[in-house]
Structure formats: C-alpha cells, structure tokens
C-alpha cells in the first residue's frame, strides 16, 4: 500500500474529494455531509482542512474550525473521514497528529470534538491513542438519528455525544505524540460499560439498544456531576468500559 503524505486542501477539486470521502466512509445522505461551500468558507474564517494523500489520491481528511470557548482560543475538529481501504492503517492518527502540530503553530492549546459514546472503536482511538479527555455529555446533540449507515433499518436513536478535550500540551498527549507510552494513571474511581458490538445490538434488538444507551447516558451524567474525568478505555470481547478518574492537573 502506498505511503501517505499530509498537506492542506486548498482547491475546489480537493474539497470535492472531501465530500466524496464522507459519502464513502459514512454512507450518509448528502444532507448530513459537510458540503464544499462549508469547507471553503470555513477556510476564509480561519479554519483549514488537512488531506492525507496516496500519490494523487486523497484517502483521508480532517476538517478543523477556528474556535473560541470563553476566553480560550482553541480549535474544533468538525469531521474526519478515511477511505475504507485505508482504514485501520494509521491514516486517521497521522491526520490527528498533523492537526495538533498545525494548531500548536497557531498558538492553540486545545482542540475539541464529539463522538458517539456507544462506539468502542472511536473511544479507544480518542482516549487511548490520542490522549483526549472528556467531562461533558451532550444528549441528542444532532437530533434523532434515522440514518445510521451501518444498519439496514432506520434506528430512531438519540444522537448522544461525548465532548472530547484534547489538551495539546499535556504530559499524556506529548508522550503519545512522540510515540512513547503515556504516563501511568491512577486507579479509576468509576467505570461506564458499553456493548462491545453496538451495531450488532441495534440490529438484533433495538429496544435493548435504546435501554443500554439510556443507562450509559445516566451513568456519564452522574460521573460528570461528581467532577470526574473520563481519560481511558478498556476494550473487551463482550463489553468495553470507559475509565473515569479524579481530575488531575495538566491532564
């Protein structure tokens, strides 16, 4: 497989490639995709899009928005997509680390984004490989989800999301960026379990899936009400679990 390089997308053709990659990776209707005009306009407003290229072919991208949270100038990672034949080959990680480098060069210390808390693969990537942390749970963030591309029927599930905070200069993130092991964390004070195969559960028993989602929502809300921080994830064959800790300086 051809080696990939990362560079900024600047042309209309490259932005069209980002839209096509979303179709391929997510299988969502066009209404749910970030369109070319959005990518172009956000670039004029201080955002940017980094593409991963294998030769002349774009095989992944990450779209970054300039953001302000209170008095904090940060970044917001709106969408990332990787071509199916390049998934699980390190392209996503390469894009995220390139995003970190670019953001640091702009003087930004944090990047934020969201993911579905029921997705074990995303949780492992964001928490364990990138070193992001979470202290916020958003219920039904995008409205009811009727178009999960992994399913054969419309799911009608709330689009709950965890809000990631990527502290670009934390000891954990700095170590991971250098390819080293992250500093050992204290024992978690609470865990939140999720099904290991969420898509399969929704297909087999949508009612049970809805119950599991509601349980996870309430457990996270309880944890965050106690000021706990989610900063780790353990994957298992039957179930996986989020690890929550007492807050520590610099995480």
How would you name each of these model-derived features?
Residues 4-84, 231-236, 248:
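A conserved beta-strand-loop-helix scaffold within acyl/acetyltransferase catalytic domains
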Residues 12-24, 173-190:
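A short, well-structured alpha-helix characteristic of acyl/acetyltransferase catalytic modules
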Residues 67-77, 87, 109, 186-191:
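A conserved beta-turn-beta hairpin within the catalytic core of GNAT-like acetyltransferases
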Residues 86, 90-98:
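Conserved acetyl-CoA pyrophosphate-binding loop and the N-cap/start of the following alpha-helix
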Residues 103-116:
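Conserved GNAT acetyl-CoA-binding A-motif
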Residues 114, 124, 128-151, 232-235:
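Conserved catalytic-core motifs of GNAT/GCN5-like acyltransferases
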Residues 139-187:
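Amphipathic alpha-helical blocks and their helix-capping loop/short-beta junctions
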Residues 187-251:
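Charged, low-complexity intrinsically disordered regulatory/assembly segments
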């Amino acid at each position: 497989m051809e080696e990939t390089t990362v560079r900024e997308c600047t042309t209309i053709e490259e932005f069209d490639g980002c839209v096509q990659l979303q179709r391929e990776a997510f299988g969502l209707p066009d209404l749910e995709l970030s369109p070319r005009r959005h990518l172009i306009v956000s670039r004029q407003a201080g955002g940017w899009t980094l593409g991963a290229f294998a030769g002349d072919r774009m095989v992944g991208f990450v779209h970054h928005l300039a953001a302000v949270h209170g008095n904090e100038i940060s970044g917001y990672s709106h969408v990332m997509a990787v071509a199916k034949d390049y998934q699980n080959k390190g392209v996503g990680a390469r894009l995220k680390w390139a995003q970190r480098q670019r953001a640091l060069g702009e003087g930004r210390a944090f990047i934020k984004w969201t993911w579905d808390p029921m997705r074990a693969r995303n949780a492992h990537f964001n928490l364990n490989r990138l070193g992001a942390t979470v202290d916020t749970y958003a219920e039904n963030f995008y409205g009811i989800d009727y178009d999960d591309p992994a399913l054969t029927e419309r799911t009608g599930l709330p689009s709950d999301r965890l809000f990631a905070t990527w502290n670009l200069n934390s000891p954990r993130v700095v170590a991971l960026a250098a390819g080293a092991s992250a500093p050992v964390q204290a024992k978690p004070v609470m865990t939140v379990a999720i099904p290991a195969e969420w898509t399969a559960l929704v297909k087999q028993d949508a009612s049970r899936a809805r119950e599991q989602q509601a349980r996870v929502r309430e457990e996270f809300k309880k944890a965050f009400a106690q000021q706990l921080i989610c900063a780790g994830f353990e994957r298992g064959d039957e179930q996986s679990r989020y690890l929550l800790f007492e807050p520590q300086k610099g995480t």
